[in-house]
């Protein structure tokens, strides 16, 4: 059996909602590295806000114990956690954060070290960039062996 992959983009709100649906039992099937540090998580949020290219999260449609259709996260748990932590004010922007978008009246954005709530209050247009950031998602279908190979290939890890 082959693998079929289709690409999607999700907003931050989609990822936030997905986090609650996944639960602890659905952590990614591939663990490529140690958990992200706070600095790496903050840099991911910085990249979201500033529109830098991002690796896709990888999901699979499946059924839960009750037979409901759910998504299983195959790769990208740390990205989900970074989004959720920033949305819940448990993560701050990097100290050297530079906003690479347009500002109101050319003002300088000094949001380094701020939580999302602080950014919303002082720089609402920066917070809006986080809220509307598009996150790439690869939705794959196939058996578990093929799915593992698919994710490995997405990350350049040839067997």
Label each PLM-derived region with a short phrase:
Residues 2-10, 29-159:
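Basic- and aromatic-enriched surface patches that contact anionic nucleotides/nucleic acids
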Residues 21-30:
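A short, surface-exposed helix-loop junction/capping segment
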Residues 15-16:
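N-terminal intrinsically disordered, low-complexity segments enriched in P/E/S/T
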């Amino acid at each position: 059996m082959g693998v079929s992959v289709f690409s999607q983009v999700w907003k931050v709100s989609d990822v936030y909602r997905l986090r609650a649906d996944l639960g602890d039992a659905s952590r990614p099937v591939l663990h490529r590295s140690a958990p992200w540090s706070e600095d790496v998580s903050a840099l991911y949020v910085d990249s979201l806000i500033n529109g830098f290219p991002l690796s896709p999260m990888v999901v699979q449609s499946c059924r839960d114990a009750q037979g409901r259709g759910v998504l299983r996260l195959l790769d990208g748990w740390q990205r989900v956690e970074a989004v959720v932590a920033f949305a819940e004010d448990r993560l701050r922007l990097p100290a050297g954060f530079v906003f690479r978008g347009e500002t109101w009246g050319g003002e300088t954005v000094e949001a380094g070290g701020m939580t999302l709530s602080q950014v919303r209050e002082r720089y609402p247009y920066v917070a809006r960039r986080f809220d509307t950031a598009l996150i790439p998602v690869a939705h794959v279908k196939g058996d578990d062996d093929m799915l593992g190979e698919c994710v490995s290939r997405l990350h350049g890890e040839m067997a």
